[in-house]
Design a protein with these regions (language model features):
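His-Asp phosphorelay/catalytic-motif detector in bacterial-type signaling
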Residues: 2, 46-48, 72-78, 198-200, ...
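Two-component/phosphorelay signaling modules centered on CheY-like receiver
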Residues: 12-30, 43-44, 165-188, 195
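Receiver (REC) domain active-site loop signature in two-component systems and cognate sites
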Residues: 56, 208
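C-terminal output helix
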Residues: 103, 107-116, 120, 255, ...
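CheY-like receiver
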Residues: 121-156, 160, 166, 273-286
Length: 286
């Protein structure tokens, strides 16, 4: 998978660090040292994902994001805000400005590549839907692309597979009002529940005492009915090996504990949009 990534930061060393990492994964990299240049690049070039630093002199990252998301010509480009580790307020402002995801400094390689690849896939689907909408004047596609996924009538149906009561209660609290959440405390029951219900995402905890969560991920990917169902892994710190194995098995994304509500909301929104776009594309060719 390759794509054109725009890195926006006023500190050249930060730009170079991200550029080297992305080039190593065969992405094409564009750079901008300030907000106006970033906006101009998005308007003039085929940018697939923007990595945008929050703290920049003059026009900061929030204003850049807000302008990109308010312009119909650039609103479909995914924006990842790069924030300081302890600045929860930055994530709130980023969501309000329209950011699609967050990365915290220092940026972890696994997180960087997972977020970028996830959003590149979403951008590819968005481009395909935009093309079909422009050539066929398909009203259903246009409505899907413009829909706000936080509204009551489009609230996603999500399954959480977890056995720890405290963890379940935290996720329920985080997603209250933004998702229709079901819970399965037994992974085998969760498998059948996922197969029999029209979920738009499954959250799978790695913290089972006597069950390998990756087994469930593998089973869901092997079943025709759940092959394209987005899966997010909820892992503990230090489980990078399991996360990498999960990505190899086909999970779409992951979160590490302690889970941040804003990151969970943003990642879930990305996966739900991807699922709905995929469903629309498959329906349009049948």
């Amino acid at each position: 998978m390759t794509a054109r990534i725009l890195v926006v930061d006023d500190i050249p060393a930060n730009v170079r660090l991200l550029e080297v990492r992305l080039l190593a994964e065969y992405f094409e990299v564009l750079t901008a040292g300030n907000g106006p240049d970033a906006i101009e690049t998005c308007e003039n070039g085929k940018v697939d994902v923007v990595l945008l630093d929050v703290m920049m002199p003059g026009m900061d990252g929030f204003e850049v994001c807000k302008r990109l998301k308010s312009d119909p010509a650039t609103s479909h480009i995914p924006v990842v805000m790069i924030t300081a580790l302890d600045q929860v307020s930055d994530r709130v402002r980023g969501l309000e400005a329209g950011a699609d995801d967050f990365l915290t400094k220092p940026v972890n390689d696994l997180q960087l590549m997972t977020r970028v690849k996830s959003l590149v896939r979403l951008k590819s689907l968005t481009d395909e839907l935009r093309l079909r909408a422009s050539t066929t004047r398909n009203i259903g596609i246009e409505e899907l692309l413009s829909r706000n996924f936080a509204t009551e009538d489009t609230k996603p149906k999500v399954l959480l597979v977890d056995e720890r009561k405290s963890s379940i209660e935290r996720i329920q609290k985080m997603l209250r009002g933004s998702a229709d959440l079901d819970v399965a405390t037994d992974p085998n029951a969760g498998f059948f529940q996922a197969a029999e219900t029209a979920y738009e995402c499954v959250l799978i905890s790695t913290a089972f005492a006597d069950f390998d969560a990756l087994r469930l991920c593998s089973q869901l990917r092997s079943l025709d009915r759940t092959r394209f169902l987005p899966i997010m892994l909820l892992a503990d710190e230090g489980e990078e090996g399991r996360i990498i194995r999960g990505l190899e098995l086909g999970i779409n994304d992951y979160l590490t504990r302690p889970i941040d509500q804003h990151e969970l909301t943003a990642r879930l929104r990305t996966q739900v949009r991807r699922k709905r776009y995929n469903d629309q594309l498959r329906a349009s060719v049948t």
